[in-house]
Amino acid sequence: MSAPPAPPPDRSAPPDRTDSAQTEPTRPLVRRARRARMWLEPGLGVKRWIFLFVVCTFVGAVAFLHFTWTGPLHPLATKWILWLNQFAEPGVFPLYAVGMVVMALALAGALYSITMISRAMLRGTGTAPETAVNVLYERKTLSRGMRVVTVGGGTGLSNLLTGLKTHSSNITAVVTVADDGGSSGRLREALDMVAPGDLTDCYAALSESPALARLLLHRFGRGEGLEGHTFGNLLLATLSEERGGLGTAMQDIHEILKVRGRVYPATTRPVTLVAELADGRTIRGESRFAEQIRPSRIERVRLEPENPSALTQVLEAVRDAEMIVLGPGSLFTSIIPALLIPDIARAVRESPAPVVYVASLMTEPGETDGLSLSDHVNAITRHLGRTPDWVLLSNSKIEPAVQRRYQQEGATVLTLDGAGRDLRGRVRFAPLIQAGTARHDPQKLAAALMQLWDGPPRRFSLPGQRD
């Protein structure tokens, strides 16, 4: 797979000293010309109104001329024309040229006044006039992007959303809400609500404002009752309490946060994640998995209470999706729990959209120890009832120092073993790793998914091969 396109050159960089004197005075004019040209880009819905304005102005001018020449203003119109005639010069500047100059000045004045009115209105709404065309162009372009539903939770999902929002605004994140530890667990127990932590991360990832994203993720380091909580978690808890539930508060949340896309909990009912192990034991509560699973392994996970309902908005998004992405994230605690909602699982099974599983880079200590990629896919198939159409796996090498750091915590690189040849035709390799980490690069991952959406790749890769 080809790497994502290089970023555009920094046009704000200073020009060479040799021509700086010539370039500097023209910069404002060049920037204005570029902005003016952008208003004429296809898809903005502006050119039709410019055309209508020109036509109406011409018709209005002709009608006004007819009115003044045939109506009670005829004497005044005659004096006006005679006054203009004094500026004419036969053979050099004829009468019709005088009229054209006056008409051009009048049109320029009208356009200037409309521009200033628009700028004043934009400033009143908090939008910088200089960036209005860029914002409009970006939103129009993103509104035509892929309709994608992402399923999961944790850092993996928020990373994915960070990359996807640069390609589309038609994003629906379906977030697992079974966490029972940390700030989420405390709020869940105190207010009988779903865990808000992963929802907060997704809202921050889709936020158009970096300042708002930082605010949502701010974690209080002191204060009785506040220490350990993030502002975003408290905001979601407040809206859930005020509106009588998180489900009814979702529209308010989206309007307040102005995110690029939609974020929904997999269910609005507080649920507990239960793991059934190979040795017959049962563990209740996600926060206990890592410590209590070993030396056994997970056979199946389920929710208590069973058969929680899903939001209507989630089911509609799945039905309308052009791609459904599972992960990246923890297999048994982030991805599969959302697929245990019967309505969501049924909608995904019946959807004509391709289902893409973004494989983790490392195993989860105590959760997926010793599992290969084919084991991951089999677990998804077993719980969902549908095998992913695509499996996206990174072929970038994790730096040895990073691997050693993870190995000290009990994590190893996820591999595609011999049994993985059963996945032939489904696996797609791409360089997805963020340099110096064992995490997916948001932009590389989004670019790989967009390539899958644009059309099936010409060939697939198996271990040992490279794109």
From Swiss-Prot:
InterPro entries: CofD, CofD-like_dom_sf, Gluconeogen_factor. Its main location: cytoplasm. One of its GO terms (cellular component) is cytoplasm. Pfam families: CofD (PF01933). CDD domains: YvcK_like. Required for morphogenesis under gluconeogenic growth conditions. PANTHER family: GLUCONEOGENESIS FACTOR-RELATED, UNCHARACTERIZED PROTEIN YVCK-RELATED. This is Putative gluconeogenesis factor. It comes from Deinococcus radiodurans (strain ATCC 13939 / DSM 20539 / JCM 16871 / CCUG 27074 / LMG 4051 / NBRC 15346 / NCIMB 9279 / VKM B-1422 / R1). The lineage of its organism: Bacteria, Thermotogati, Deinococcota, Deinococci, Deinococcales.
